[in-house]
Amino acid sequence: MSLAYSQATSLLLSSTTRGGVPSLMHIPATNSPARINTGATPFWKLPFPARPLRQYKSITRARNQVILTAEKSVDVDTEKNTHHQKATAETTRELVERIRWMLQNMDDGELSVSPYDTAWVALVEDIGGSGRPQFPTSLEWISNNQYPDGSWGDRKFLFYDRILNTLACVVALKTWNMHPDKCEKGLKFIKENIHSLENENEEYMPVGFEVAFPSLIETAKKLGIEIPDDSPGMKDIYAKRHLKLKKIPMDLLHKMPTSLLFSLEGMKGLDWQKLLNLRFEGSFLSSPSSTAYALQHTKDELSLQYLLKAIKKFNGGVPNAYPVDMFEHLWSVDRLQRLGISRYFEPEIEECMKYAYRYWTDKGICWARNTNVQDVDDSSMGFRLLRLHSFPVTIDAFKQFEKGGEFCSIPGQSTHAITGMYNIFRASQVLFPGDHILADARKYSAKFLHQKRVNEAIVDKWIITKDLPGEVGYALDVPFYASLPRLEARFFLEHYGGDDDVWIGKTLYRMLYVNCDTYLELAKLDYNVCQAVHQHEWTNIRRWYKDCSVGEFRLAERSLLRAYYIAASTVFEPERSGERLAWAKTAILLETILSQKLHSEEKHTVVDEFKHGSISISGNGRRHQTRISLAETLIYTVNQLSSDIKQAHGRDIHQQLHHAWQKWLTTWEGRGNLGEAEAELLVRTLHLSSGLDESWFSHPKYQQLLEVTSKVCHQLRLFQNRKMHDPKGCTIDLVTGTTFQIEAGMQELVKLVFTKSSEDLDAHTKQSFFAIARSFYYTAYCDPEAIESHVDKVLFDKVV
């Protein structure tokens, strides 16, 4: 309901309404100071007429029901809109069910077939001694998957990928004297394009290409296939091969699991009896090609069973790595969260996290379960997600990736991948007090990524994605503590390529449940539905702003919009409209009151008027406009919010909300710690409007969270003011961008929120404290110009 009242000092609202909106009535002025008592109920005490809230349809039974689209409301409806809303709801439901099925049916990983690995499998001769192919279906897959130009490979054209895959497939077909026409087409493609290798971006060179490709050329020559290898590009590849083979510690290779097990194919001088002790579940580091090469030499039964399982799953072909279960479970959750649609899949995500934790080790993890080789990319992603889901993971996982203050992708290697450093940077921001190795990792990875950005060199060796520079740039510009959920989703919707993103292993490959157009379609649809709800609410906020004369206190409409944006970017779900509006209006009123230059007597009058729910008049019979408007607006808004929450949750929170405001006003009047008081008021308002029972407010964990949140929010407000008014005198840590005290407070809060304890609060309640602190951090950390651009992008730029 909107309130319309005059700026004249002697107007009150009567109980008569027009169309549900209270009408105006003139009240004669009295001649002496007194509290108004006309026999009529003051407008700020009027009961709110029952009004239909915007209703929503949900498709889950989660604690916070997920909203699909708005039903008919009293003020916005046409037959066309209703049809569109129903169609949107149905499309959303279908997409959610499709993704839910994918998550519920995850096993060892869904990914594309690698022609290169399939060719190595096809080369295996029957271990029974018949002289025939051991895996004829792999040869069949090769024969059925040649492109018209004669090549094999991923649909994304890279010469490295196409030439390696094509030569491997030609060698396999030639070995078994099959399809000479396909062999000829493949050779023609290779000879016409091999010179292009020297022009390719070296960052996109597949894993082990400099060893695998020359080995294939040698095998091809034994079959009578001549491949031109005297070009400058080929000579460079041979030089890299010589250097790499020279560095391989053969004694170490046979003694303990290393990443070298992933690329055994074509290597000479191997002691297979020793190497067989290093396989797990029949495979060598989940590599079909490496395992096929081992089977050729050992006829090992476990290796045979591993390959048979993979061939059956992928209909004759095999992928570049299998299984990739840890990779798939973790990266899928990460994508769903950053796209802003994880709330649809909370049970499924919880199962993914339980699965990941089951195979987590103190040394970290790799792309597959139970491997004895770990990498920083998977370990960082696993650590971050498990910690954010309150699983007790240890920072010891990062020790083997650190040496002398530097961090590497794989223990013992000195190379760095952008995504590895990017994910360790993200993980390092979820640190608890005393996590020194994470602080070191943050410093190192931030410096590395900043330098790459300055040099415009953000190209990764593991993935070709739509906008990796954008992803890295967002992480550097908006750290975890400042990353509001809707802001992150809005940017990631532009960075995420869906099906078009491709990974780089031994060949290019697709992770079908990680990079998925279905995720993208749902995310875009959901974002635009939420945005439409937010825009509708913004219209109502503007009406409230004008009707309550908030603008009379010189609070600019842009400040109003910024306050709503902060709330909507944090509590964005349509069904949480009550919480969002309560937060926004509370923040707006706080800013309005704090902007007034009132002397102590005026402050006291405002506090007294609010406390008693009545308005004082001056000696000449007139009421002071500023004082009265502040009190009237505040009383009215508290009543309005209380009425809305009672209608939504069936609970009357008026007394508690009034008390929360009274406590803040008392602090304001007495010049107390307003930063802490402001945070406490916002927390209380958010919890009351969410329907949280007041009994939880006295819970020891609640009190601890409130104390830490209030303290860090106060520090952030002071920091923000210093940045604005005395930037030269504001000491800023070069790594974190704030102060040591603020970072320590945020670390303490993160630990309280994301660790479980006996007699704990529920996760949703705990995370709301972090949400409030995050909003303070965001406004203190980000420049006003950046925030202005974020406001427009999040609230008004539709995702297409």
UniProtKB/Swiss-Prot annotation:
An example Gene Ontology molecular-function term: terpene synthase activity
One cellular-component annotation, GO: chloroplast
Compartments, record wording: Plastid, Chloroplast
Intervals of motif DXDD motif: 375-378
Enzyme class: isomerase
Catalysed reaction equations from the record: (2E,6E,10E)-geranylgeranyl diphosphate = (+)-kolavenyl diphosphate
Tissue expression summary: Mostly expressed in trichomes of leaves and fruits.
Function: Involved in the biosynthesis of labdane-type diterpenoid including cleroda-dienols, and peregrinol lactones and furan derivatives, dopaminergic diterpenoids that can bind to dopamine receptors in the human pituitary gland, have probably ability to lower prolactin levels, and are used to treat menstrual cycle disorders (e.g. premenstrual syndrome and mastodynia). Terpene synthase that produces kolavenyl diphosphate from geranylgeranyl diphosphate (GGPP).
Protein name: Kolavenyl diphosphate synthase TPS5, chloroplastic
Organism name: Vitex agnus-castus (Chaste tree)
